């Protein structure tokens, strides 16, 4: 019998195409990760159906697609949306009071429909629901934290925020409690790097190291490649023209959400302190899409205020670009455009569980300069595609940025290494092959679950994993 998966991804905005990455603090790399994972799983011979369950949102401020109860993604994959809480779109910190009602709705649904063989919960909120649902349905629970509350709290305290401020902004206590309960109940904890399991998850008393399985995510190599066209180059040039005096200079490109953790003001500060960088490069900030900063949530407003203040402090007009809008299809083009001009991709985040944008950039031939926190260490060790830096030290960040654009021969080595390294180590086919192998190893000989179809499906192995096209 072929397997059925249920993936829980409750916050942010997710749909089958045209993801609004960077629109807000809740719609970022995790959203893309989950969508790519469910599509890749469905494209295997072992898997019959993958359901991605998320929140139904009926809010005029967001697209109508998010109010569809069911959305077809591709054969074997669908998005199911359940209403919980008010109609309007809410940030994840405000969803906690409604999760019990959502759990009851899911239980009612599966009383009438075929239950999954596995539940995979993404982030603490989904973990909270996944624990209760897996116990009721008596099926295994897989958990991916994506980012963890204890690690986030530690880094925010380092920036000067108090525990009370952090609690008010992020409901961090509820999140950590949910993570502890999920780690206790989960059968498998999927991490992207060894650093996650050894350092980040080990901060939790409920974490059992033997449950952790390191399965790095992949890159869509059809989108993220190093063959650029004159058409897309001209398109990106036009995007930058309103901002830059000379768009031919090597760009320092960053792509992220406008949230505190991403540490964008520090990047601008380092750039502003360097006469060399201001003379020789441009700084490109792709921070999601916005109509007006006045319509953003409080955290984003604060981040943009700091960004504009720092740009003004160093009079960086004509050297820094911060477009209000971009299309999802333009992200790969931005990487290739930056590479064609001898630029680098910069990730200045305070914490980085993995760093999917680093893989995307490298796959497009763009070297990286990244935070030395978390996943980037392992990406660089496998790819040798750039430099790492302590981003809390502004002067060190300045020096490393200068070094990144100083040696053309070294730049070419990093660029080539990145392309080859990502192709070798990071693909979604490899990810799902490892993912299903882990399930086979964990459950084919386990007596923890009596459901024979799980064991039989896993015993098949993954020898002919990918469906023929």
Which sequence ranges carry the predicted segments?
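Catalytic cores of nucleotide-sugar-dependent glycosyltransferases that transfer UDP/GDP/TDP-activated
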Residues: 1-469
């Amino acid at each position: 019998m072929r397997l059925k998966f249920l993936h829980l991804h409750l916050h942010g905005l997710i749909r089958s195409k045209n993801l609004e990455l960077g629109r807000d603090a809740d719609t970022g790399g995790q959203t893309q990760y989950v969508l790519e994972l469910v599509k890749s799983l469905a494209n295997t011979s072992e898997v019959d159906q993958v359901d991605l369950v998320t929140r139904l949102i009926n809010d005029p401020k967001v697209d109508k697609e998010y109010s569809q109860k069911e959305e077809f993604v591709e054969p074997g994959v669908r998005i199911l949306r359940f209403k919980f809480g008010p109609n309007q779109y809410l940030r994840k910190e405000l969803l906690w009071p409604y999760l019990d009602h959502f759990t009851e709705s899911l239980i009612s649904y599966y009383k009438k429909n075929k239950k999954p063989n596995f539940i995979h919960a993404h982030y603490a909120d989904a973990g909270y629901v996944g624990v209760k649902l897996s116990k009721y349905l008596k099926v295994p629970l897989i958990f991916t934290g994506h980012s963890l509350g204890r690690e986030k709290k530690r880094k925010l305290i380092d920036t000067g925020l108090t525990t009370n401020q952090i609690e008010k902004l992020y409901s961090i206590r509820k999140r950590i409690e949910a993570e502890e309960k999920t780690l206790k109940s989960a059968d498998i904890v999927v991490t992207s790097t060894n650093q996650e399991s050894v350092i980040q998850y080990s901060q939790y008393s409920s974490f059992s190291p033997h449950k952790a399985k390191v399965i790095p995510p992949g890159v869509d190599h059809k989108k993220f490649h190093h063959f650029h066209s004159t058409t897309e180059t001209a398109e990106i040039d036009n995007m930058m023209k309103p901002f830059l005096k000379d768009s031919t200079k090597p760009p320092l490109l960053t792509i992220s959400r406008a949230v505190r953790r991403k540490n964008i003001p520090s990047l601008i500060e380092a750039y502003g302190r360097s006469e060399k960088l201001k003379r020789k490069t441009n700084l490109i900030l792709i921070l999601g899409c916005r109509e007006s900063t006045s319509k953003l949530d409080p955290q984003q407003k604060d981040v943009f205020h700091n960004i504009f203040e720092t740009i003004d402090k160093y009079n960086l007009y004509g050297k820094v670009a911060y477009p209000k809008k971009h299309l999802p299809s333009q992200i790969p083009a931005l990487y290739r455009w930056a590479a064609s001009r001898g630029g680098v991709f910069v990730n200045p985040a305070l914490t980085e569980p993995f760093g999917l944008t680093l893989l995307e950039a490298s796959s497009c031939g763009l070297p990286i300069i990244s935070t030395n926190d978390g996943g980037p260490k392992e990406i660089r060790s496998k790819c040798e595609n750039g430099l790492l830096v302590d981003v809390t030290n502004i002067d060190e960040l300045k020096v490393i940025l200068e070094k990144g654009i100083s040696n053309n021969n070294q730049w070419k080595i990093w660029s080539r290494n990145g392309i080859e390294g990502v192709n070798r180590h990071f693909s979604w086919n490899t990810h799902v092959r490892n993912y299903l192998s882990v399930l086979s190893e964990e459950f084919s000989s386990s007596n923890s679950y009596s459901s024979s179809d799980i064991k039989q499906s896993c015993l098949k192995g993954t020898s002919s994993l990918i469906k023929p096209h």
